[in-house]
């Protein structure tokens, strides 16, 4: 997915002249070597050692006494929501069936005791559907233990939910053209250039609350600010933050669920079959999703995997094929609709060659080619596309996962909400009352998340967040 993934240079600041430069350089050289062994041409440049002067030209806002130099290496960034939605649409294009707002509430078994299907609840309508399957693969992340229990399993894989929090600050607030990676006493902290912003994080703390709504706390935000400010020439404050977001990592853990430091738990994935007919995969990370998928399916089909080898490495995601031709066509579209170069880059990065479909919408309704009045980084067509092509059912889907307005603007997208609702309403069949209910629901969520950020710990922050009810609440499991 070359349109979704961008190479990003990072600096690893050095505090010691000799041993640290040699130690870090050797580690990153190994990283480069392993990357070179991957199939295909090399995607990233090799690492470089930088003097203090050269380091300062790349990141002027690094405090003068914070480092004597740096090692520059390359990594990549991706919008996880865009990647996942594009992945789902790609799977559907190959014949898969995908259903959002649908929850597995029970697993079914045959006469032999093997799992042979699942009972699903449509969280929108409340309707139950039973799906039969030759084999069920459980890839439910931090819900792994809950869903394993549906099969009556008590000894399967165990995961620890680890919370990671990031803050978002305006790009002009920090002077730099590259990212930073900083070692902390618990893990690492990244300062990542991202479009018009800097994303700073992450934390790594065990999460023992309900996994549905992880939230940032005052303690999380203070931790990030303290560690970032230790190396920045112009310290950040809470007033600089325009957004935060929190997520949970499903970290594999031996034995039972109880644990202390999530930073010491493995990030690798494991595949197991706790009961016949059920394969469980847990652990891993976003960047290894294709390897995880291959391993899970190979495990599930057993000996047939030899005759049916995985071809995932040969399958590009939607938007990748024809990308270069679309870049050229985009010049014509930009001239026709008055799009600035930044908008064209934004659209190509998010949609790749699928941008043609957005242009088709604009040709049918030229008003869709205009930016949103209170969120001009996005076109009105992107809201339409999020509903018509990407399965958004609610305003929160559009502001959290089809756009990222929830943390890209200070008000979490509230000013743009009426216009977004007006675009979505006819596509989703909302009358005025339903549209207002959607606006009210998202407003309550945004306000609750804002308030939660001022709470000292996870328990109190979650309690504040839960003051806003879900538009489609999860159902109890039948384990």
Which residues does each PLM region occupy?
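Short, hydrophobic/aromatic-rich segments at coil-to-beta transitions
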Residues: 114-119, 175-177
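Glycine-rich beta-alpha-beta "Rossmann" dinucleotide-binding loop(s) and their flanking helix/strand
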Residues: 91, 146-165
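Core beta-strand elements of the Rossmann-like FAD/NAD(P) dinucleotide-binding domain
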Residues: 124-135
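A conserved short coil-to-beta-strand element within the FAD-binding core of flavoproteins
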Residues: 100-116
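C-terminal accessory subdomains/tails of enzymes that are appended
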Residues: 4-7, 15-34, 38-65, 71-82, ...
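Residue-level detector of anion-binding/catalytic polar loops
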Residues: 97
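A structural signal for short hydrophobic beta-strand segments in well-ordered beta-sheet cores
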Residues: 104-107, 190-191, 271
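Short beta-strand segments that buttress and anchor functional surface loops
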Residues: 72-73, 118-123
């Amino acid at each position: 997915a070359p349109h979704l993934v961008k190479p990003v240079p990072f600096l690893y600041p050095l505090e010691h002249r000799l041993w640290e430069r040699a130690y870090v350089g050797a580690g990153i050289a190994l990283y480069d070597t392993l990357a070179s062994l991957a199939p295909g041409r090399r995607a990233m440049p090799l690492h470089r050692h930088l003097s203090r002067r050269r380091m300062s030209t790349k990141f002027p806002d690094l405090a003068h006494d914070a480092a004597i130099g740096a090692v520059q290496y390359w990594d990549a960034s991706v919008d996880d929501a865009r990647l996942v939605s594009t992945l789902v649409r790609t799977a559907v294009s190959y014949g898969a069936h995908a259903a959002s707002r649908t929850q597995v509430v029970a697993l079914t078994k045959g006469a032999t005791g093997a799992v042979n299907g699942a009972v699903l609840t449509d969280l929108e309508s409340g309707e139950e559907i039973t799906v039969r399957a030759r084999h069920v693969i459980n890839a439910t992340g931090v819900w792994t233990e809950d869903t394993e229990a549906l099969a009556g399993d008590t000894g399967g894989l165990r995961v620890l939910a680890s919370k990671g929090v990031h803050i978002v600050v305006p790009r002009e607030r920090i002077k730099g053209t590259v990212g930073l990676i900083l070692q902390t006493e618990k893990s690492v902290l990244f300062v990542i250039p991202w479009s018009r912003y800097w994303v700073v994080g992450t934390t790594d703390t065990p999460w023992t609350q309900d996994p549905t709504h992880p939230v940032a706390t005052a303690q999380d935000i203070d931790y990030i600010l303290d560690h970032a400010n230790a190396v920045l020439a112009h310290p950040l404050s809470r007033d600089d933050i325009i957004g935060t977001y929190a997520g949970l990592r499903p970290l594999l853990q031996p034995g039972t669920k109880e644990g202390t430091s999530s930073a010491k738990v493995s990030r690798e994935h494991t595949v197991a079959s706790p009961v016949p007919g059920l394969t469980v995969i847990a652990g891993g990370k976003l960047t290894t999703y294709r390897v995880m998928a291959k391993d899970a399916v190979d495990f599930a089909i057993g000996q047939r995997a030899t005759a049916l080898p995985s071809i995932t490495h040969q399958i590009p995601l939607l938007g990748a094929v024809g990308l270069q031709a679309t870049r050229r066509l985009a010049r014509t579209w930009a001239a026709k609709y008055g799009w600035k170069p930044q908008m064209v880059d934004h659209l190509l990065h998010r949609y790749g060659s699928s941008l043609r479909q957005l242009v088709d919408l604009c040709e049918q309704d030229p008003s869709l080619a205009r930016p949103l009045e209170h969120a001009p980084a996005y076109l009105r067509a992107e809201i339409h596309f999020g509903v018509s092509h990407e399965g958004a059912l609610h305003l929160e889907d559009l502001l959290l996962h089809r756009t990222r307005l929830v943390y890209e603007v200070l008000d979490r997208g509230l000013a743009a909400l009426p216009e977004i609702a007006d675009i979505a309403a006819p596509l989703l069949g909302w009358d005025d009352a339903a549209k207002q209910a959607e606006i009210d629901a998202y407003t309550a969520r945004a306000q609750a998340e804002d308030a939660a950020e001022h709470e000292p710990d996870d328990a109190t922050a979650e309690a504040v967040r839960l003051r806003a009810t879900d538009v489609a609440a999860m159902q109890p499991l039948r384990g």
